[in-house]
Amino acid sequence: MAKKNKKDKEAKKARAELKNQKNQKKQEKKFQKNKNKSLNGEEDDESDQDLDEILSSFSKKQIELEHVDITSVEKPSCRTHPLMFANPQHNKHELFIFGGEFTDPETKLTHFYNDLYSYSIKNNSWKKYVSQNAPLPRSSAAVAVHPSGIALLHGGEFSSPKQSKFYHYSDTWLFDCVERKFTKLEFGGRDSSPSARSGHRIIAWKNYFILFGGFRDLGNGQTSYLNDLWCFDISTYKWTKLETNSKPDARSGHCFIPTDNSAILMGGYCKIIAKNNKNLMKGKILNDAWKLNLTPDPKKWQWEKLKNFKNQPSPRVGYSFNLWKQNKSVAFGGVYDLQETEESLESVFYNDLYMFHLELNKWSKLRIKPQRQTNSKNSPATSKRKSNKDQEKELQDLLNSILAKSNLNDDDDDNDDNSTTGPNSIDDDEDNEDDSDLDNQEDITISNQLPHPRFNAATCVVGDSLFIYSGVWELGEKDYPINSFYSIDLNKLDGVKVYWEDLSAIEEAKRLGDRDSDEDEFEYEDDEEDEDDGEEEQDAGPLEGDEDEESESDDDKQAQMEIPDERSWLPHPKPFETLRAFYLREGANFLTWSISNNRNLKGKQLKTKSFELCEDRWWERRDQVTLEEERLEDTGGIIERDTTTKPSKRR
């Protein structure tokens, strides 16, 4: 045993010596490289400029603009960490992208943006806005939109071209979604508004914008994570800092979503001192959940810690989280750091899609359904879609007759038979889409696969569609921006619309592999031995391969079980049945149930309640229906697919 220990020590000593030699060679190589730069006059480049000078130059150029410059463009330039948000105006079908950053892979210089883009979903067209009153260039800012048509922007970060110097903003801006105009808000003292930061989150609730968390750079490589809570009153245009008895730990990159009378906070990221090395700050991915109980008086707001939710995704950070409907949110992507040392970081990236039901406190994993094979305008599916109006009229006649028997018709129901509450709102735009709109979609392809794994994607929900723009993927120490744009119909889940996608750099990196990993082989070995000597490891999520094996075994187990039905008296969706088809089939039953439970309502209000109940039921049984769909696909069973919805184009 003693001989073995002695041999291990000698081997370890030899590896350490080899490591020192390699590090010395690296330092010599770096010194020679810097020396050559100095001799060639390259030492005084843009990266050494003072940040105040850079920002001052931007400001001067911006002031010279005499008017707003509006240009039609094919698409935004490639960038990461921008803001993307929907126009909150009803039926506007438009989204905005602001700011972001891009690091040139050849020069390694980083450029920050302050241009604004608008995207018309109906016309599939982009416009670029450049004006003198726009915020200075930045990335990783926070934004939220209010139903009144305004958006609130706060903070963000900026750096020198080689990212040797960083700057965090503390300014607050209002954006008018109608006029496409930014307005900077001024406040009194230093503590009258949130401090400079990035990585924070803002939500809108009633007449307030609510801000929590984030981080700021303190210089000398030090970072401060925040857990302060602020509210912005849109009636007074003032920030107020709120103090609570208990509150979540400081963090950035968290999820923050409003509900009717609360706000839900989940996850996030911070850095802590490593237990075995006080000089090393290790990243910590948080997996807790909190509820902020909201009242009309902000001074009475209080935090409440929540238990873990059912079917919760594995721990991760950098995943998007967007409010979809009043009681549902959707999450995409993210990253989990498996192992972090002073010189390396191993991570797993995700591209899964989840729905979180705010009332049930339950997660559901969403899956893309296989594409139908037809796209002809004269196909049976298209003919079936044309008869869909007849089905809707039959349903309306039936609903009105049920209301008439109970003497619950509105006075104007007879004149409004064609106004269907519910399913029309889902697909009317598609059924009424003219040929010119179809022509604008010619360059869009449909994929049966979710977008490539990534973190920090810019996302927003417009209507029932989730839009995904940009994102970051890593290999070794290199970041790869993903220049791409997608949308997913969250009701149908019948494919991913790919507007554009460039994965060439990522595919090349995967083909070549991480060259740095071969060079650092001995560092990894030493790090592993250090962990064996007693380092407490960070909780690790499953490796990608292990995760697949676990998910497969979990799926096998789920296939053998039934998910309990707490409201078995309500109709059950069929496999592969859309929400629209479910309502057309069972709308009368849902209306009857709504009448018995809403005695004070009439006519249209009862129709609205019946559709809301149908929608809740469709999502409530989504996990069970997904199991049934998977069983049918695995066994090759005959599937009754819904053909009332519009077939997707394949080009």
From Swiss-Prot:
Signal peptide (residue range): none
Record flagged with keyword Nucleus: no
Biased composition (Basic and acidic residues): 7-31, 556-572
Region listing for Disordered, in residue ranges: 1-50, 369-392, 406-440, 511-572
Keywords for this protein: Kelch repeat, Phosphoprotein, Repeat
Feature: compositional bias, Polar residues: 371-382
Residue ranges, compositional bias (Acidic residues): 41-50, 426-440, 516-555
The keyword Repeat belongs to this UniProt entry's keyword annotation: yes
Kelch repeats: 94-148, 150-199, 208-259, 262-310, 334-383
GO cellular component: cytoplasm
Superkingdom assignment: Eukaryota
InterPro entries xrefs: DUF4110 (IPR025183), Kelch-typ_b-propeller (IPR015915), Kelch_2 (IPR011498), Kelch_domain_protein (IPR052588)
Gene3D superfamilies: Kelch-type beta propeller
Record PTM Phosphoserine, positions in chain: 47
Note from the entry: Present with 4010 molecules/cell in log phase SD medium.
Protein name: Kelch repeat-containing protein 3
Species of origin: Saccharomyces cerevisiae (strain ATCC 204508 / S288c) (Baker's yeast)
Gene name per UniProt: KEL3
